[in-house]
Amino acid sequence: MSGTEEAILGGRDSHPAAGGGSVLCFGQCQYTAEEYQAIQKALRQRLGPEYISSRMAGGGQKVCYIEGHRVINLANEMFGYNGWAHSITQQNVDFVDLNNGKFYVGVCAFVRVQLKDGSYHEDVGYGVSEGLKSKALSLEKARKEAVTDGLKRALRSFGNALGNCILDKDYLRSLNKLPRQLPLEVDLTKAKRQDLEPSVEEARYNSCRPNMALGHPQLQQVTSPSRPSHAVIPADQDCSSRSLSSSAVESEATHQRKLRQKQLQQQFRERMEKQQVRVSTPSAEKSEAAPPAPPVTHSTPVTVSEPLLEKDFLAGVTQELIKTLEDNSEKWAVTPDAGDGVVKPSSRADPAQTSDTLALNNQMVTQNRTPHSVCHQKPQAKSGSWDLQTYSADQRTTGNWESHRKSQDMKKRKYDPS
């Protein structure tokens, strides 16, 4: 069965795009005149004996056929890997019989082969499985055989190059007279040994670049980071640009999506770096504003004001002693009327007082010359010793003045007969 779909079943394979036009799907791309003539010429050729196989059918009859992988390779060469497609429109299980523990299954399948311009051919295939003990394996074998048979029958409708020449009996008889060529040796150096194909990827990417430069498949990305980026392809009026493969568009969309993800990651890193700089700036200002603490060493004195306090204390004690001595001298000073033999304390100093004062001054000088380390080690004990020394000096001075007063009283009694 053959035919050409009108509007591809009412336009079911087309859908409106965001730009207001329609995006061409498979089955709507037209062949150019040059491409049409080249395909038509190739389909008229008949297959050689290298493509045709034979087997014995029921009743001892010899049957010629084309293997499934060969017919698929021929279709790819004629139409291109993305220029044709096949689909199973219907599949029926005719019977499933169990006989002596073995299954017998028959399945029929309707297969349609469609080209990129919308033309298609459809045919029926049949598959049989006999004598298997597993029901599942029997159904699998019958279904696959039915689909393969229907595919070969549908492709055969396109021309001699896809198997239609096998039905010509005269051609097969003449074909048997031709000497069969020896099979070519397999060249393992050209075998595929790795998954990556750099030449194919580079060619696919380069084919997309001119179209993007001309503005035909402009990809519009969504700028919102919360939604995944997607590409919108506007409609194109040029028919030649409509033949761009869907795989190339998908690869370009994937490339743009990866670029967008990299941009979002870079923006996130920049924001995080700015936040870290903002957090580190106040801490740095606080550290600069705070005065640096002096380094603590073992030679640094514990209290710096102790020597100054000690000097002030010594100066105050000295002034108090001098003032006390002056008050005592004024108190016990004798007027000139008392007689010539009276000794005036204010006129000359007492030997005991002079010696005590000199001893106190020497002790103060010695204390001032004492190293600071000793003062820092025992400040409390030193202040206590100075208080004791001052108290003893006052006691000696007071005792000397009392003895001097007694001697003056004795002299007064001698000079005064009454």
Curated annotation (Swiss-Prot):
Chief location bin: nucleus
Stretch list, region Mediates interaction with RPA2: 221-280
Biased composition (Low complexity): 240-251
Entry GO MF terms: DNA binding; identical protein binding; single-stranded DNA binding
Pfam families assigned: Rad52_Rad22
Gene Ontology biological process terms, A to Z: cellular response to oxidative stress; DNA double-strand break processing involved in repair via single-strand annealing; DNA recombinase assembly; DNA recombination; double-strand break repair; double-strand break repair via homologous recombination; double-strand break repair via single-strand annealing; mitotic recombination
Phosphoserine modified-residue sites: S199
Effect of R153A: Moderately defective in both ss and dsDNA-binding
Phosphoprotein listed as a keyword: yes
UniProt keyword annotations, A-Z: DNA damage, DNA recombination, DNA repair, DNA-binding, Nucleus, Phosphoprotein
InterPro entries: DNA_recomb/repair_Rad52, Rad52_fam, Rad52_Rad59_Rad22, Rad52_Rad59_Rad22_sf
Chain intervals with Basic and acidic residues compositional bias: 402-418
Annotated stretches, region: Disordered: 219-302, 368-418
PTM per Swiss-Prot/TrEMBL: Phosphorylated upon DNA damage by ABL1, and probably by ATM or ATR.
Sequence positions bearing Phosphothreonine: T318, T335
Annotation: DNA-binding region: 152-156
Sequence positions bearing Phosphotyrosine: Y104
Cell location: Nucleus
Biased composition (Polar residues): 380-401
Disulfide bonds: none
Gene Ontology cellular-component annotations: nucleoplasm; nucleus; protein-containing complex; protein-DNA complex
Subunit structure: The full-length protein forms heptameric rings. Interacts with ABL1. Interacts with RPA2; the interaction is direct and associates RAD52 with the RPA complex. Interacts with RAD51AP1.
NCBIfam families given in the database record: rad52 (TIGR00607)
Family: Belongs to the RAD52 family.
Task of the protein: Involved in double-stranded break repair. Plays a central role in genetic recombination and DNA repair by promoting the annealing of complementary single-stranded DNA and by stimulation of the RAD51 recombinase.
Protein name in UniProt: DNA repair protein RAD52 homolog
Species annotation: Homo sapiens
